[in-house]
Amino acid sequence: FSKFQTNKKTSLSNVQNYIPIYDRFFSLNNTNYNSINLNHLWSLSDIKEKDGDKSENIFNCKLKNISDIEDFTMTQKVFFKMAPLLDPFKYIVGKYNHTDEHLFNLPSFDKSIRVHPKIEDTNNSSYIDGFFCFLTSQMLNSHSFIHGVDYYGSFLAIKNNYKVNIIDDLDYLITSE
């Protein structure tokens, strides 16, 4: 995942493997906490390029088959699902303290690093959503579940220039205090 740290195509920074929900499934320690991934069939090995101007989230990627001892790879269009750790609408209407210097800190295995409690919560909707994507991929690849989506891994990062479509929520934003 080190290639994602320097990839300017994604506009991501501070990319990390550690996700708090992993605390429920793995025995994490200071040496392994940032190298754990769920057991999925394909993983991202490289991001080649953004796929046109139609979407900020579709990339041509090199995928590696995890179970193949011959290191079989393929290139495919991949949708990157961006799931914010904090509700952007609550942020816009001022439900979060904008002056909190720890508001945008990513969670860490090192509990001395201060982060917003919602970001640290293993039940954060973004972590649950990512785990659900993993489970549907398992069903797709192991049980031919036709409504599953392929899962290539989860990472946490800061999305620079994050955009939110507020058109359907204008009434809420205008009337909220």
Each predicted region: which residue ranges?
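Conserved ATP-binding subdomain of kinase catalytic cores across diverse folds
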Residues: 37-38, 43-177
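Juxta-kinase regulatory segment immediately upstream of eukaryotic protein kinase catalytic domains
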Residues: 1-67
